[in-house]
Amino acid sequence: RMEVKEAVILDFLMDRMIQAVLYYDTDRELNAIDSRVLSFISDNYKKAYSYQAEGKSEAEKLYLRLLLVTDYVCGMTDSYAKRLYQDMNGII
């Protein structure tokens, strides 16, 4: 049962975070929700992305944005991922 719960949490976080970063660092304006979701990602991860993305094509930047999310979610503790999932879903 625990693995199923964890898979649901990770799937949700990955889906939501990926949606939020799709247009990060592009000419397209982010909506309020995506901006808020991006605010959860630490500046260290964003700085690493910016460093790596400098001078890259849009396709390469998209790959790096997806990697940004993967690195962020993989770096979460189980308890933090669960708490973030609950917060994002309004679960108390």
Descriptions of predicted regions:
Residues 1-92:
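Histidine-centered, transition-metal-coordinating active-site segments
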